[in-house]
């Protein structure tokens, strides 16, 4: 009888635990057809769908003087959202506005290449609050 009770208690303690989903690693690079004229800030943002709305789940800022920029970002399962992930990168110079942008949908792959498209005002774009 004590064995049956011990067996029942062990089942209750163990339960139906499932291992957590592993973190997802997104590896990629940011490129641009034009060279950088000075040190730039590059923000790589990841967006996910939450409650029917697209929301930023992670942003990483890099500072570089050369492209391509190689990156590796780790997303934990809570950051994954309800479906597809989207990536956006922006390039800006200190004290200036956004100079170039790239966007891409992440579809079942962890390796991405974001090709920055310079704005027509590159490399002299101003942000609205620095004029």
Swiss-Prot record:
Places the protein is found: Cell outer membrane
Lipidation (S-diacylglycerol cysteine): 16
InterPro entries: Pilotin (IPR039366), T3SS_Pilotin (IPR053740)
Disruption phenotype: In mutant, only a small amount of YscC/SctC is properly targeted to the outer membrane. Mutant is Ca(2+) independent for growth at 37 degrees Celsius and secretes smaller amounts of Yop proteins.
PROSITE patterns: PROKAR_LIPOPROTEIN
Outcome of substituting residue 125 to S: No change in activity
UniProt KW keywords: Cell outer membrane, Lipoprotein, Membrane, Palmitate, Plasmid, Signal, Virulence
Keyword Cytoplasm: no
Described function: Involved in the synthesis of the type III secretion system (T3SS), also called injectisome, which is used to inject bacterial effector proteins into eukaryotic host cells. Pilot protein that is required for the proper localization of the secretin YscC/SctC in the outer membrane. Also required for efficient oligomerization of YscC/SctC and stabilization of the oligomers.
UniProt name for this protein: Type 3 secretion system pilotin
């Amino acid at each position: 009888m004590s064995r049956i009770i011990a067996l029942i208690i062990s089942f209750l303690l163990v339960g139906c635990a499932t291992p957590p989903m592993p973190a997802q690693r997104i590896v990629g690079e940011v490129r641009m057809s034009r060279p950088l004229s000075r040190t730039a800030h590059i923000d790589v943002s990841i967006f996910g769908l939450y409650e029917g709305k697209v929301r930023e789940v992670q942003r990483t800022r890099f500072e570089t003087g050369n492209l391509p920029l190689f990156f590796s970002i780790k997303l934990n399962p809570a950051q994954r959202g309800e479906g597809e992930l989207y990536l956006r990168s922006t390039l800006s110079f200190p004290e200036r506005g956004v100079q170039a942008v790239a966007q891409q949908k992440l579809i079942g792959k962890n390796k991405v290449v974001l090709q920055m498209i310079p704005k027509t005002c590159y490399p002299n774009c101003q942000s609205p609050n620095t004029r």
